Amino acid sequence: LTLKIQSNSLQHKTIMIQKLFSKSEALSQMHSFVESKADRYQEMRNYDFGKLENNFVSGLSPAISRRIITEEVFLKTILSSFSFNKVEKLIQEICWRTYWKGYLENRSQIWTNYLTDLVDLRYLKASREYENASKGETEIVCFNGWLNELMENGYLHNHTRMWFSSIWIHTLKLPWQLGAELFMKFLLDADPASNTLSWRWVAGNHTLGKTYLANPSNIKKYTGGRLFPENQLARKAVESNQDGT
């Protein structure tokens, strides 16, 4: 599978990540996470309390995506401290990126279609709806904040990525392809497979009969009450073009 990505963008991200993480710094962050947070990952992983240090995730995805450290090293470190049953969910989440890569490699038409769609949808970038969403100037305060966080830090909590994607697709009614492109542009850990397939899943194009619709109460709960977009989000998902592939 040949992934046609702008090499300059990837090179720029790699340089930024290398500035954030030397190998020793990445290993230090990994050990700190395993020692202080890994045992609570399963119960706390969906909470986004704002700053990374307040959350129960590792924040290592940029380092892993650029192979500063590998999944194997991370998994061995975790399993040297905990039984499999204690950290099963954490192990599953680390392996998701590998699963997505294999899935897309065996269904390369999904990527080809995505690239074609981006060309066909270019005209929408001139719309006010797209401009407001891509600049964080909507009427949904939490969405605007996430967009700013994405652009400034190159990172969003995984649960927040789902909320963002859902609002983009189902509330703002913008094509998932343009949202996926935005993530690819700004996320330091952006991966063509996991990013594309995750957006398709939220849109309802990945698993037949399944869409993801962000819920204001869910956002309030999992942000510790920081955010509550009451009466601002769509209650019905946009009809998907499901192909089940």
Task: Give residue spans per PLM region.
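C-terminal catalytic domain of photolyase/cryptochrome flavoproteins
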Residues: L3, K13-N158, S166-T245
